[in-house]
Amino acid sequence: MAIKKRSATVVHGASGAAAAVKNPQASKSSFWGELPQHVMSGISRMVPTLIMGGVILAFSQLIAYSWLKIPADIGIMDALNSGKFSGFDLSLLKFAWLSQSFGGVLFGFAIPMFAAFVANSIGGKLAFPAGFIGGLMSTQPTQLLNFDPSTMQWATSSPVPSTFIGALIISIVAGYLVKWMNQKIQLPDFLLAFKTTFLLPILSAIFVMLAMYYVITPFGGWINGGIRTVLTAAGEKGALMYAMGIAAATAIDLGGPINKAAGFVAFSFTTDHVLPVTARSIAIVIPPIGLGLATIIDRRLTGKRLFNAQLYPQGKTAMFLAFMGISEGAIPFALESPITAIPSYMVGAIVGSTAAVWLGAVQWFPESAIWAWPLVTNLGVYMAGIALGAIITALMVVFLRLMMFRKGKLLIESL
């Protein structure tokens, strides 16, 4: 019979009463065990905001730059003021401007939503406002107050936003702080409303303000600024290294937390017009297309079926979902045989994404698959990168499965 470790030891005092003594090691393990769940809670609530903002933003660009043929170096507002549009085209352009503005606002709420729900998952609904405020300050930090000795005057300056790094740190800290304060601050029943609607919100807001201003924004901004400086200074080599890293992080867990973190990094660079989102968008679709393709070519290449019966229809489904920008269709393959699937689609995603970036494919619009393809610069090269990555993925997984089958390490259920 398995005996589970207890998180507390019962000690009997002189009076015979039992007292629970916390085990620090168990509490530490519990913290690290629960933390990924809290982070995923924030990510799952943030994704709809990202999708809404991204799709509406992409739609505005589709109207302006594909349908109305506005030159890529001209903004929508400049096009409105050019006097070249009238009637229905002018109405379309106005709608494109509205979609761009609204989509940008929605997109800007993604990180605050993430931070709010991470804090909420940790500290309950009382921690939600603190998390939201912290997430908002990570994208729109408070101005820095500086004294200029030359003019003997105070002036303000804009710090580098801490973005995802800052939101992650402040949401966790604020969540546990509110949870601790709620447990430790004991008031009479008639003051509970005062505690939950005034005292805890004010204390947590002051903490977030001070922590973000003096610690988290400088730290996160320093990291973000350093990364951008290095990538910009490295030029083409930096862009290729960035593409490889983003592609690997995007593909590795097929929509999981690492993928979402890579999305935050990529989108922050894209919205600030530092680096395009090309590599991430390509890496999203390569794994499901490649694994789906493997179920089609395995018998033609090897003379035998190398996948279990249920994976063949799932391969076709994965390919279809890939064109919708959904990589989760590849998950059954990764679960069934991670040793063959994960290395294959990782290599395919890295090679295909990097090749497309190196050959000049550019995508600035924060969406993937068919939703953004009409807005890609050098679409032919972009699609060639997807094809290259998918073919590499398919060939690798077929070859690895064949090797394992011949060694007797792969059991295949026949159709």
Curated annotation (Swiss-Prot):
Domain topic, free-text comment: The EIIC domain forms the PTS system translocation channel and contains the specific substrate-binding site.
Gene Ontology terms: biological process: phosphoenolpyruvate-dependent sugar phosphotransferase system
Membrane-spanning ranges: 47-67, 102-122, 127-147, 158-178, 198-218, 238-258, 277-297, 319-339, 342-362, 379-399
Species of provenance: Escherichia coli O6:H1 (strain CFT073 / ATCC 700928 / UPEC)
Annotated protein name in UniProt: Fructose-like permease IIC component
A GO CC term assigned to this protein in UniProt: plasma membrane
Ranges of residues in domain PTS EIIC type-2: 35-415
Record PROSITE patterns: PTS_EIIC_TYPE_2
Topological category with respect to the lipid bilayer: Multi-pass membrane protein
Alphabetic keyword roster: Cell inner membrane, Cell membrane, Membrane, Phosphoprotein, Phosphotransferase system, Sugar transport, Transferase, Transmembrane, Transmembrane helix, Transport
